[in-house]
Design a protein with these regions (language model features):
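Active-site-adjacent structural elements in enzyme catalytic cores
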Residues: 1-203
Length: 203
């Protein structure tokens, strides 16, 4: 257990690079994270959560450049959305590249990506040169929590490190999810970013 992400960047980077599992604060809720290239780590996260692999897992990336590693057909409209709201609490569902693991891809060969508004987390991803899983740190079917002790009770013994976040607002919302796999933008989940914010983009 570590006190803050800022003071734990080196150890978190080492743990993730070595295939470990971490619970990390983001700009929204806690994430259950590992590097995306380690199949064993991905399987372990699915087992910890009790999550069906067919659901996929959202991926956090440090910059817009990483979108091209995981996704395809990223046109100017999608780039405009990314540049408008990221880093920030918006997740985009995109068409995945063929070589992306099925353990992190969603239905219909999709992938969910976002850039978190957390400079320490971005530093870690840049250091390890990888995106990380951003699935919520809770058991599948349970509501996400910002209560450190509840998370420790449910998941604390199953991960390699848990870094506390300075969450002052206890009702912090998860990211908004947009499906941009077709010409029509679909709001899958309205979270921290509202529908009106999306509608106000000038394409």
């Amino acid at each position: 257990m570590q006190s803050t992400l800022k003071n734990s960047k080196n150890i978190v980077s080492k743990i993730l690079s070595n295939g470990g599992i971490a619970i990390l604060p983001t700009d929204t809720i806690y994430s259950l994270s590992c590097i995306t290239s380690n199949t064993n780590s991905l399987k372990k996260i699915l087992k910890i959560k009790g999550r069906d692999a067919a659901q996929g897992m959202p991926i956090l990336v440090p910059s817009i450049d990483y979108f091209n590693i995981y996704a395809q057909n990223i046109d100017n409209k999608i780039k405009k959305i990314i540049k408008t709201f990221m880093p920030g609490p918006l997740t985009l569902i995109l068409n995945k590249k063929p070589d992306v693991s099925n353990l992190i891809s969603g239905p219909n060969n999709t992938i969910a990506l976002r850039i978190p508004d957390n400079s320490d987390l971005i530093d870690i991803m840049n250091k390890i040169k990888s995106g990380i899983t951003g699935t919520s740190a809770n058991l599948s079917g349970k509501i996400h929590s910002l209560d450190n002790y509840k998370i420790i009770k449910d998941l604390g013994t199953k991960v390699d490190i848990f870094v506390f976040g300075n969450y002052k607002v206890k009702n912090k919302k998860p990211s908004t999810i947009l499906d941009v796999t077709s010409d029509k933008i679909k709001i899958i989940r309205e979270g921290a970013i509202k529908k009106a914010d999306i509608d106000n983009i000038n394409f």
